[in-house]
Amino acid sequence: MNPLLDAHNLTHHFETLLYENLSLSVNEGESIAILGVSGSGKSTILNNLSTLLPPKKGRVSLLGINDIYALSAKEQLSLRRLQLGIVFQAHYLFRGFSGIENLKVASILSGESIDKEILESFDIAKVVHQPIGQLSGGQQQRLSIARVLTKKPKIIFADEPTGNLDKQTATRVMEIMFEYIRTHKGALVLATHDQDIAQSCDRIYHLYDRALHRVK
């Protein structure tokens, strides 16, 4: 079986070296958690893997594409819109829109319809018509994940997706995401500091000493 994602010898640095010669593959139906302290490079890895930030060295293969950074900017944008789901820590919802309008943007760009069952599952169906500014941090976080699932992506990259959620809600949200990748034969790559959330994934890696160390 060919992996959905295959990263080879990634190296990245800003002022200092974050990691070097990092390799990772993710298969259909798999969930991967990356643990690490703040500033260790977890978010940067997700950005490298999802076309948002080219690594300084190395190659990323996604969904049969040998090197995603050999694509044009337009082709990378199309890949993100149609095949990838990215859950940002800061949500990046359109502030001037209501919740449902944010979902409609994802629906239009991907050609997929809004799934009302997802809204019910995330307990946001009753508030989805309110302006973003009137939603709590937890509601915004759930809405941002619902927006990603609306696109029906093949691979989901999630950066601290449960950071604003209580433990019970976080568990429920992760169950929905796991069910999604099983049903749609997709994959999930998760960056988190939450040990409990990480333990629910198929594999766990700890980022330290400039490398990924498998712990599960």
Where is each model-derived feature located?
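Conserved ABC transporter NBD signature motif
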Residues: G58-D67
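Conserved catalytic motifs of ABC-family nucleotide-binding domains
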Residues: K152
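Catalytic Walker B motif of ABC-type/P-loop ATPase nucleotide-binding domains
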Residues: I156-D159
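Conserved ABC ATPase "signature" region
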Residues: D67, E112-V127
